[in-house]
A protein has these predicted regions:
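Class I (Rossmann-like) S-adenosyl-L-methionine-dependent methyltransferase catalytic domain
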Residues: 1-96, 110-117, 121, 131-197
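Conserved acidic residues
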Residues: 99
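Hydrophobic adenine-recognition pocket in adenosine-nucleotide-binding enzymes
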Residues: 106
């Protein structure tokens, strides 16, 4: 994630939280949890406000959470009630630790040329047969928009990046869907959602 994007979240943490914390997101959260055993270990990767971590904890899952923004980490720690780690995406360095990784509207801030490395890190961090949920704004735009860097993806764009990350054994897309934005007044904005294994 570039410094401009981190600065955006550090300076707008409260405003961002007020616009996302109470968004009804259980359809996506439960779809992800449907692939996991009860009590599984989850990493909320780029956790933002901590909304999803709080939900997963309430359902009895073991949750670790991280975010690159110092201010978002403070908010997420309060929201989720756990110690949230301040960490950049490229600092993930775990091996077979998690049953599931939830990267909701987070790694879309990574430039496309750096995404293969991020997916390699995600693949290494999940256990054998573990799953990873990712979401990206739907499309082909890449660059700065409203003070943040975005990489928008289509199904084809995601598959190219997954193949580039590991040509011999890429993540398999086990579930994929297009959704509208869950925030009020933004239903016309489309999102690519995928569950990888």
């Amino acid at each position: 994630m570039n410094n401009t994007t981190l600065d955006y979240y550090n300076h707008n943490a409260e405003r961002f939280t007020s616009g996302t914390l109470d968004v009804q997101f259980t359809a996506v959260q439960d779809r992800f949890l449907g692939y996991l055993a009860p009590g599984a270990r989850i990493l909320d990767y780029g956790c933002g406000s901590g909304r999803d971590s709080r939900y997963f904890l309430s359902k009895g899952y073991q949750v670790e959470a991280c975010d690159g923004s110092e201010e978002m980490v403070k908010i997420a720690t309060k929201t989720a009630g756990i110690a949230v780690k301040q960490m950049l995406f490229e600092e993930l360095d775990e091996t077979a630790r998690y049953d599931g990784i939830f990267a909701c509207a987070s790694i879309l801030h990574v430039p496309s040329k750096a995404l293969p490395d991020i997916f390699r890190r995600l693949k290494r961090a999940v256990k054998k047969d573990g799953i990873v949920y990712v979401s990206f704004k739907y499309g082909t735009f890449e660059g700065e928009r409203n003070g943040r860097y975005f990489t928008d993806l289509t199904e084809e764009g995601l598959q190219k990046i997954l193949t580039a990350a590991d040509p011999a054994h890429p993540f398999v897309v086990v579930d994929q869907w297009i959704s509208g934005d869950a925030r009020p007044g933004r239903a016309d904005e489309k999102w690519l959602n995928a569950i990888l294994q």
